[in-house]
C-alpha cells in the first residue's frame, strides 16, 4: 500500500476518533454539569492530574473550580467531590445511587470476574450484598465486639511489646513490627493461624501486601483502566499489578494448606472455613459468589486492607508521640490512672479515657491515610450541591478535604487532640470525622480497626516512652502518597517505663 493510499485512511481514522471523543465530551455541555479543566482530545485530563500526589493536585483544582469539579480521564467521566457537604450529600443522601463501583478492567489480570469481585471493588448488586453480609456476620461470629477477639488482640499486643523491648532502647524503625502484629490479627481471623515475626513466608507476604497497595495509584494504571484495549498489549499488561499477582499466589498456598485441615463437621474456626462451608451449600448454584476464585479475593481484600491501613495509622501514632512528647506524657498519665502499669488494656477502659481516645482519633485525622477513599460510580442521574452528575460517572470522594476542612477544624493542618474534646474534657466526634468514608460502602472493618488501634496504642504507651534518637534530626510530619499516605521514614527509641 503506497503512501497515497495511507493518507485517506489516516484521515478517516482521525475523524472517527475525533467523533468518538466528541461523543464522550458532550455531557460537559449539559446544563449544570460541574466545571473543570478543558480535556485534551483522546487523553482528556490525564496530563492534568499528578498521579504521584493526587490529593495535592485535587486541592489545587478545587481552588480553581470549587467543591464539585469534573475531569475526563481519557474517555471516562469523573467528578471530584470536596468538603463535608458535598461528600455527605453524595454518599449518604444519594447513598443508593452512589454505592456502585466503576469497572476496573485491569483487575481481570488478578482473576476478577462477574461472580468473583471480592468485597471492596465489587459492583453494587447481589454478589456484593452476599459477601458484605457474609463478612460482617462471620467477623461477628468470630468474636468481633466480644471478649474472645479482644483477647487475641491483647495477646498479640504483648508479643509486639516484647519485640519492641528486644531493641533495648536503641534506635529502630517501628513499621515492620507494627505490620507483623496487625497482620497476625487478620491472619487469625481469616486463616486461623499466627505467624512468628521472623517467618520468611510471613515476611514475604507482608512485603507483597505493602507493595501491592502502592499499585493502586499511578499514571499507567489509570491509562489502562481508561483505555482497556491496551491490556491486550503484553508489554503493558505485564507491568501493572505485579506485586498483587505475587501476593495472591502466596495467599493461594496458605489457602490450599488450610483446606487440608478443614473439618466440615466442625463449626468454622475462621473466615476461610466459614467461606468453604458456604461453598458447600452453594454447590450447583452458578449465580453464587461463593466459589474458589472469590475466596482468594475476599481473603486478600480483608488481609491487605485490614493490615496496611491499621499498621500505617499506628506508625503515624508513634511518630506524632515523639514529635509531641507533652501529648505522650498526658496519654501515659491517663493510662496509669485508669489501667495502671500491670493490667492489660481492655476495650471497657476506653470510655474512661477521653484524652487517649481523642489522641487516637486525631492521629487518624491528621495522618489522613486514605485521602481519596475508594472510587464510587453513579447508577442514575443525581444532583450534588446544585450540579447535575449523570449516570455512569466515576466519583472521587476527597476525604482529605473533609478531614482538613478549615471551616470545621480549629487547626486543620496541625496535630491538635483538642479537636475531639469539649470544654469539659469529654470526648466528642465531629461529623466531619470520616476516615472510614460514609454511606453504604463505608469500611466494613471499622469496628475491628477501632479495637486494634486502642489496644495496640495503649499497650505500647503503657510499657514504653518513645523519643527521637539522640543526634538524629527531628522527623518530618509530612506523609508520602502512594494510594495510602504513609509517614516519611523515621526511627525512634522505645525506652521501657
From Swiss-Prot:
GO terms for molecular function: anandamide 11,12 epoxidase activity; anandamide 14,15 epoxidase activity; anandamide 8,9 epoxidase activity; heme binding; iron ion binding; oxidoreductase activity, acting on paired donors, with incorporation or reduction of molecular oxygen, reduced flavin or flavoprotein as one donor, and incorporation of one atom of oxygen. Pathway: Cofactor metabolism; retinol metabolism; Lipid metabolism; fatty acid metabolism; Steroid metabolism; cholesterol metabolism. Its EC number is 1.14.14.-. The keyword Lipoprotein does not apply. It is a peripheral membrane protein. GO terms for cellular component: endoplasmic reticulum membrane. Its cofactor is heme. A cytochrome P450 monooxygenase involved in the metabolism of fatty acids, steroids and retinoids. Mechanistically, uses molecular oxygen inserting one oxygen atom into a substrate, and reducing the second into a water molecule, with two electrons provided by NADPH via cytochrome P450 reductase (NADPH--hemoprotein reductase). Catalyzes the epoxidation of double bonds of polyunsaturated fatty acids (PUFA). This is Cytochrome P450 2D6.
